[in-house]
Amino acid sequence: MDSCSSTPFVTGVLLPSAVFSFLFCTLVSSSFGLDEFNLTTCGIRGTLKMQFLKFLENTLIFLGSGNLTAHIGILVMKNDLSNSRIWRFTGGLYGNTPDILHELINLLNFWNTGSAIFMQ
């Protein structure tokens, strides 16, 4: 999966309050559900714009179908420059790729200002 070895960028108007970056690592279960392996790790930087979400959707579709089970570990940091606070949310997303995409978009919409960092 060399296509994910470098960090892709989404171009467009970047506002400091709307820029985020994240790293996600997808684990895919075998057909027997006995072991898991690291399929790919991608770092993506962009803005909360439709073209970025479309890119993310295409990436997840490329990673697999509804038959695959994936896990994304998440760390979100939100920096409010007006009062210099950093908020953190940690959690995990489990499920097939369409479910994860839906939940990830919801999370990104929730953290639609400041910066968000997603880490395995």
UniProtKB/Swiss-Prot annotation:
Residue spans crossing the bilayer: 8-28, 55-75
Protein name: Putative uncharacterized membrane protein YHR069C-A
The keyword Membrane is assigned to this record: yes
Location(s) in or outside the cell: Membrane
Domain of life: Eukaryota
Major location (coarse): membrane
Protein's membrane topology: Multi-pass membrane protein
GO-annotated cellular components: membrane
Miscellaneous section: Completely overlaps TRM5.
Swiss-Prot/TrEMBL keywords: Membrane, Transmembrane, Transmembrane helix
Record organism: Saccharomyces cerevisiae (strain ATCC 204508 / S288c) (Baker's yeast)
